[in-house]
Amino acid sequence: MSRENHIYEPDWSGRTDQLCSVNKPVIKKDALALVTGKPVYVDDLAPKDCLIVKVLRSPHANAIVKSVKKTAAERVPGIEAIYTWEDVPKQRFTMAGQTYPEPSPYDRLILDQHVRYVGDPVAIIAGKDEKCVDRARKLLKVEYEVLPAILDFHQSKDNELLVHPEESWKSLCPVGADNQRNLCASAEDHNGDVEAVLAECDEVVEHTYHVRAAQQAMMETFRTYCFMDTYGRLNVLSSTQIVYHARRILSNALGIPKSKIRVSKPRIGGGFGAKQTVVAEIFPAFVTWKTGKPSKMIFTREESQTASTPRHEMEVTIRLGAMKDGRIRAIDLYTLSNTGAYGEHGPTTVGLSGHKSIPMYGSLEAYRFAYDVVYSNVMSAGAYRGYGATQGIFAVESAVSEMAARLGIDPIRIREQNMVREGQFMPAYYGETANSCALDQCVERAKEMIGWDEKYPCRDMGNGKVRSVGIAMAMQGSCISNLDVGSATIKVNDDGGYTMLIAAADMGTGCDTILSQMAAECLECDVDDITVVGADTDTSPYDSGSYASSTTYITGKAVEKACMTLRKRICALAAERMNVPEDETEFTGTGVVHEKSGSSMTMEEIATAAMCNNGIALEATESNCSPVSPPPYMAGAVEIELDKETGEVRILDYAAVVDCGTVINPNLARVQVEGGLVQGIGMTLFENIQYTDKGQMINNSFMQYKVPTRLDMGKLRVEFRSSYEPTGPFGAKSIGAGTCNLQCDGSVVPRTADHERADCNGNCGKRMRVTILYLAAGNSRRFGENKLLYPLDGKAVYRHLLDRLAQIAGRHENWELLVVTQYERILEELAPLVKAGRLQTVFSPDSEKGISYTIRAGIEAAEKQNADACACFVADQPYLKEETAERFLESMEMQKAPLGCVFCGGESGNPAWFSKPYFSELKELSGDRGGKKVLKRHWESVIPFLVEAAWELKDLDRKEDLCCRDTGGCHE
């Protein structure tokens, strides 16, 4: 539609193709500046002579700082100041960027005497350059009282060890938090009689799904520059999504009024939710406030890996009940979330695991959603694209596909039969109805794009590889209903153009551009006529910030309202100058006309008139808050290729179809969805935050933490099937986690790829039932005492590998953990885990006669479990890493290995794998002969699994073998 014939109307339902600026692929406003390297980021804008701020971090997962000797460090030339826990304010706060009162507990200090994870700040060092600061940091001498740590979040709730024992800890909102129980949050929501409905179902899928923590890995690390202005106010220029929340958090932490603080943001080099938390701001702000000198802090990549706010690790247990015809009747969901050492975003992310997954199925008769969020002694988690929905959708969609397999129903058919549709009430979604929903169209189109009917379920390619397709659905919200506030100020410039002031943060996703498109549509001008002034607490109207997918929906509506108010004021001023009734004037975009008299004024004439003898300000500020949060929906279909020998999964084609209401900018929307797909694939196939047994992060750089590149992806295709949301600007809903990114795309890929990895196993059949045999019955003759019960790093030797295997087994529905022992003490200690259903035990008193008796007892128990294979692990290998053990098991299962064992340096060893045909031979072993005899007898059938680190496979035969891999020394 031409601009000349365009008339703005508030309702464009069914006519969005007639829009002039909205729904058009407008180029990003800052594109040229970014690609030509203009100085637009924090480090570009900070002066070269400002103080450099760094922190000394704890090497221990849980400790009390007894003293910090800083005399030698303070003597280093160029050092301005060194601060410890004794120098900082003592009021607690949260770093989570949330509206006050924050659901996240107040559990932080700037520096705390009690450090709670490896990487927790111990001291702040400020100096004239990096060289002197690094030197001073090395000279600091810290005395620690090392405390036992909780590194397994399954053991946190009601543990006698408290992560936050302090009395000053507090929770401002009723979220079920209790620091005396290590609980950051706990709650339950339900409707209907779940147990009764599940009992009536023909089939119930019950499984626990584990989603590990993952890094946002944005290109620009955390960074902040601070200075004092001429009025004695603290100015903070930061790479943040939340300028107003950041100001309040700094006020709480520093103990100074908010009016003494100004927070603004330049361009941001990515955030994906990480910068919804105040990570770097507090340290330079404290230094500048204390010294009066400008300072900056730039996180290294290692710091951004080890001291940031990654995705919450969650374990989601689901029971899903359905009838034989595929009708899903009930969902019972329990989420255990690991918030880490501090509670940022813990109480809120967990809620989305149920409230943004269960509502996708609109015909439920009953549901229950319960959760616990627990503290542990690892890096604190935070906000990340998907914000908890990712983990929950992964579990629900996996269970639905499993249900389809059990019932013999096509995975797409079971979704079509049960998915929420437009006009339907959404269970577990805050009492809301799906007023705009094209999910059915998304699923249908994804099916067509991937060629489902020709490719489902899988095809053997004849070269040791199989190909398969998978499907999943996802949803998100468009804001935090009844809470999020977006605001916009629009004013007329003296040349007739416009300036728009917003506090929404453009993180590189283009919200400045899409909000300009909306303003241009409302004001019937070109997008280039809109100048955007970004987030600044001194000049921008209040905005909650760019998170919760709220910018397009919430701030966009505020822009629309402000423009309508401004149009009226422009007409009022023009009518006054033309001496005509205001209600007879018409705003045309280029000016105001009065048809009856033929009078008119251009926008430049109106702007000039406003500067003299005028009582009407040609500007308008409007805010917006919504009582509802209409979900965007997505369907994703993927084709993968699986190497049956290695277990490698390769993405061949991904077809994503999105309903985000009216698409404001198709180009920006498409690239954001594509980026989210890559993040989801990375989370599934590449990324995994790992810790040592002492809480030290293993993958603290991009050399160890693998993020995917475009070369790792197959074909990515994105299309839109738009509904029209009546409460959104121009019918739009959100398309972003934090800004303009569809959160659900990050949830679809883990479910699809992981599930099809299982479904494609071997001949595309069912997964193997695997019993993990943990042999804990050795006699310890050369050790001098019972080596299995010998204390090592705070717990018995046998518990080290066992605890890792328990976590592994909990992530795989078809794996069972079975402990065989002759020791009653071990049976007693494991009784709580048996009661909790995490493992089973077998008492084998004859094990004293030799290992063959232990193996026989284990195999007989495995046969009762109908095991297809047994994987034998020995309890005197405490250094075997969880990742290695899980990869061994997955590799053996994926290859349907007849026999298998690990190899290192040309030598074979434990663990070992035995499929069912070899069980009888294992039971025929005698004396102290182990499974190696069976392996040698069938050596041609043994599948090798290579392990590079020999220390992982170390057997503890003598006390001299208690080697510490970190130092090369030995435990006393």
Where does each model-flagged region fall?
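N-terminal glycine-rich phosphate-binding loop and ensuing alpha1 helix
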Residues: 769-822
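Conserved beta-loop-beta/alpha segment of the NTase-like Rossmann-fold superfamily
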Residues: 848-916, 920
